[in-house]
Amino acid sequence: YFIINDGVMWQTILNILEKKAKEGVDVRLIYDGFGCLTTLPYKYYEEMRKRGIKCQVFNPFRPILNIIQNNRDHRKICVIDGWTGFTGGINLADEYINQRKRFGHWKDTAVMLKGEGVWNMTAMFLYMWGIVTNTDTSSDFANYVPHRWHPDDFEGSGYVQPFCDSPLDDEV
């Protein structure tokens, strides 16, 4: 997520993430180092890890002149179980649910996706996880491939394939 800020929204989500981590669910979180520069404490990832949540910072802010500082990850990807995912423009802060009136009335959009298309969201997240942890995540990909097929759950014959670009591809 680009912005996470303590408040009603984040505490509600954090409580669920912590509960699921305690139940043995693999809970992972990536937040942007610049987007959360003024909203989260320094080394907030350590607090998350104490709660059982695997947490990494994408491109931590370093106060030096560097073109890479502008490479930011604004994506908001939430994968629940490999079958249900969410994406959209909503950051995890109270102003995005009008609990706090920072920008006036805020209206944003997010979508819930169910089905095999969520695998692409999972792959996008795991790819970025490998980058921020500097680890080989190939075994993670095998562990998170959806193992169920629910053809009766959907009407129509459409096709959904989420896709992405990387904030690290050096495009200007």
Where are each of the predicted segments found?
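Charged, low-complexity intrinsically disordered terminal segments
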Residues: 1-172
